[in-house]
A protein has these predicted regions:
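Conserved small-residue-rich beta-alpha loop and adjacent elements
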Residues: 102-168
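Conserved active-site and cofactor/substrate-binding residues in soluble primary-metabolism enzymes
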Residues: 17, 21-28, 36-39, 73-76, ...
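Active-site-proximal helix-loop elements at catalytic-domain edges
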Residues: 1-9, 164-178
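N-terminal Rossmann-like NAD(P)+-binding subdomain of aldehyde/semialdehyde dehydrogenases
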Residues: 1-117
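Short, solvent-exposed amphipathic alpha-helical segments in soluble enzyme
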Residues: 136-138, 167-169, 195, 218-221
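Conserved NAD(P)+-binding/catalytic subdomain of aldehyde/semialdehyde dehydrogenases
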Residues: 174-226
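Short coil/turn connectors at secondary-structure junctions
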Residues: 95-98, 114-118, 144-149, 164-166, ...
Length: 226
């Protein structure tokens, strides 16, 4: 009886070619945004997400309207989940103690845990709202003491509008600025400082192969998560 394969892994040669293609595409996008700034970000957002609003950043009024469109039950669930994440993050932070000791007269050794000034949190789009990514990036950064947290997420691929549940999770998590912007262009905007964003010190959050490659290439200019 012949073996029927439901799914096969990619051949080594094909995988290498795919990685090279991804690397080149991402490199081109990053260079374009670094060179042309806002214009490049807007063109890329229009190309990949068909999204070109007057401002990529949501105003306080827009956030309020979006959050109000989410069901009360979903909002309660988001707040409940964030309460658990926040509590554990606070316990983790309390375990990171500063240390200082004078080993011999005049010689003081130690270490301090100092939060970075700004973080860019990316929450990917998809078939369903990725609210957990907002809990685990935006919220934990605020617990850590990060002064400015910028959050980015692409528009809903089904409706073409900001994903309400994700925006709500970002907002309740403590995001200082929320942008509806996705993909490599979002990574570049956060790293270089574009469409109203200030350049961040670190970028965190999951994403597809292009987002992951963008973070890899941007490492050094900004810090990234593991």
């Amino acid at each position: 009886m012949a073996i029927k394969y439901i799914k096969k892994g990619m051949a080594v040669e094909e995988s290498a070619a795919n990685q090279e293609k991804t690397r080149n595409i991402v490199e081109g996008i990053l260079k374009d945004v670094e060179t042309r700034g806002d214009d490049a970000v807007r063109e890329l957002s229009e190309k990949f997400d068909k999204w070109s609003p007057e401002s990529f950043r949501l105003s306080d009024k827009q956030i309020e309207e979006i959050v109000s469109s989410v069901s009360e039950k979903t909002l309660e669930d988001i707040k409940w989940a964030q309460a658990q994440v926040r509590r554990f993050a606070q316990i983790q932070k309390s375990a990171l103690r500063d240390v200082e000791i004078e080993t011999i007269p005049g010689v003081i050794l130690g270490h301090k845990n100092v939060p970075v000034n700004s973080v860019g949190c990316y929450v990917p789009g998809g078939r369903y709202p990725m609210v957990a990514s907002a809990h685990m990036s935006v919220l934990t950064a605020k617990v850590a003491g990060v002064k400015k947290v910028i959050a980015c997420t692409p528009p809903d691929p089904k409706t073409g509008v900001p994903p309400a549940e994700t925006v709500a999770a970002m907002h309740f998590g403590g995001a200082d600025e929320i942008y509806i912007l996705g993909g490599v262009q979002a990574m570049a905007a956060m790293a270089y400082g574009s469409v109203g964003m200030q350049q961040v010190d670190m970028i965190v959050g999951p994403g597809n192969q292009y987002v992951a490659e963008a973070k890899r290439q941007l490492f050094g200019r900004v810090g990234i998560d593991l």
